[in-house]
Amino acid sequence: MTLIDTSSWIEALRKDGKEEVRDRVRKLLLNGEAALCDFVLLELWNGARGDYEKKKLAQMEREIFCVSTTSAVWTLARELAIRCRKNGITVPPSDLLIAECAESHH
């Protein structure tokens, strides 16, 4: 299972998206290996414009596995944030959460 990040979904869904990204997402979908998480869905819904995009997102929610964002995932994301900050790196909270969601369901 591969958790696909928001930016990759956006590229894959665009008619003029990068072909390399579109191909990779397409292969994951065809092989039943694509996954979403709640935060990726939130980001996609937040950017959805018009009925077509909303229908597409609703279809994705029905058909693509969504990994759960458990309290353990939130704890891991906080711990990752602390480790990153100790090394002078500031990571957006959304990226920390998505990364730990992927890691915990790998």
Q: What is each stretch, according to the model?
A:
Residues M1-L36, W45-Q59:
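Short, well-structured N-terminal submotif of metal-dependent ribonuclease cores
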Residues A35-D38, G47, V67, P92:
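Active-site-adjacent beta-strand anchor residues
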Residues R22, L41, K54-L57, W74-A77, ...:
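A general structural signal for well-ordered alpha-helical segments in protein cores
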Residues I64-H106:
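Active-site neighborhoods of divalent-metal-dependent phosphate/nucleic-acid chemistry enzymes
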Residues D5-T6, L44, A77, A102:
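Generic structural signal for small/hydrophobic residues in well-ordered secondary structure
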